[in-house]
């Protein structure tokens, strides 16, 4: 499971001209699911993202977590994170999980975040979405559950 996280001053997601999710300060999380992912991967990423110290403290140092600053998450499913561009000119998305597998894991990820007391807004799974945000920093990180300790 891959997550691209962006620190944002505000963000929203629109489907068919209607805003379906919006946050003030917090994180935009673009989440991709692959075939081997499990709920343990969703739990790992939720834990990591909730506690990652990427918000500035009073000294301007990245020393505070999403939980500590009371930030929200705008969570957007994005199968294209598993696009393979090594051959040809068109990405291959065979590594992305099919919707019937990806949707429950995407929902589990959001549930794990909510279980930590984080306000989570979402896009619409599988829809064409317009995501708008004001990057804060900018701070953009990529986290892959396959890189967690114990995975060799």
Swiss-Prot record:
State the similarity comment.
Belongs to the DTD family.
Location of the motif Gly-cisPro motif, important for rejection of L-amino acids = 137-138
**Any idea where this protein resides?**
Cytoplasm
Signal peptide range in chain numbering: none
- What's noted about domains in the record? A Gly-cisPro motif from one monomer fits into the active site of the other monomer to allow specific chiral rejection of L-amino acids.
**Entry protein name:** D-aminoacyl-tRNA deacylase
Q: Name the job this protein performs.
A: An aminoacyl-tRNA editing enzyme that deacylates mischarged D-aminoacyl-tRNAs. Also deacylates mischarged glycyl-tRNA(Ala), protecting cells against glycine mischarging by AlaRS. Acts via tRNA-based rather than protein-based catalysis; rejects L-amino acids rather than detecting D-amino acids in the active site. By recycling D-aminoacyl-tRNA to D-amino acids and free tRNA molecules, this enzyme counteracts the toxicity associated with the formation of D-aminoacyl-tRNA entities in vivo and helps enforce protein L-homochirality.
Identify the enzyme class. Answer: hydrolase
PANTHER family the UniProt entry points to? D-AMINOACYL-TRNA DEACYLASE 1, D-TYROSYL-TRNA TYR DEACYLASE
Which SUPFAM superfamilies did the record assign? Answer: DTD-like
Kindly give the CDD domains that the UniProt entry links to this protein. Dtyr_deacylase
Gene Ontology MF terms: D-tyrosyl-tRNA(Tyr) deacylase activity; Gly-tRNA(Ala) deacylase activity; Ser(Gly)-tRNA(Ala) hydrolase activity; tRNA binding
- What EC identifiers does the entry list? 3.1.1.96
Question: Subunit structure, per the record?
Answer: Homodimer.
- Is tRNA-binding included in the keywords of this UniProt record? yes
Catalysed reaction(s)? glycyl-tRNA(Ala) + H2O = tRNA(Ala) + glycine + H(+); a D-aminoacyl-tRNA + H2O = a tRNA + a D-alpha-amino acid + H(+)
The record's disulfide annotation reads: none
Has the keyword DNA-binding been applied to this entry? Answer: no
GO-annotated biological processes: D-amino acid catabolic process
| Keywords associated with the record | Cytoplasm, Hydrolase, RNA-binding, tRNA-binding
Its cellular-component GO annotations read: cytoplasm
Q: Which organism is it from?
A: Geobacillus thermodenitrificans (strain NG80-2)
């Amino acid at each position: 499971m891959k997550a691209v996280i962006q620190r944002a001053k505000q963000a929203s997601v629109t489907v068919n001209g209607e805003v379906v999710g919006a946050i003030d300060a917090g994180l935009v999380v673009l989440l991709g699911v692959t075939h081997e992912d499990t709920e343990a991967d969703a739990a790992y990423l939720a834990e990591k993202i909730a506690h990652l110290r990427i918000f500035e403290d009073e000294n301007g140092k990245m020393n505070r977590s999403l939980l500590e600053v009371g930030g929200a998450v705008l969570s957007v499913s994005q199968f294209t994170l598993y696009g393979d561009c090594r051959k040809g000119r068109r990405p291959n998305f065979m590594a992305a999980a099919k919707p019937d597998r990806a949707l429950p894991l995407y929902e589990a990820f959001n549930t794990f975040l909510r279980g930590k007391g984080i306000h989570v807004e979402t896009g619409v799974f599988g829809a064409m979405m317009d995501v708008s945000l004001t990057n804060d920093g900018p701070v953009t990180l990529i986290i892959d559950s396959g890189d967690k300790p114990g995975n060799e």
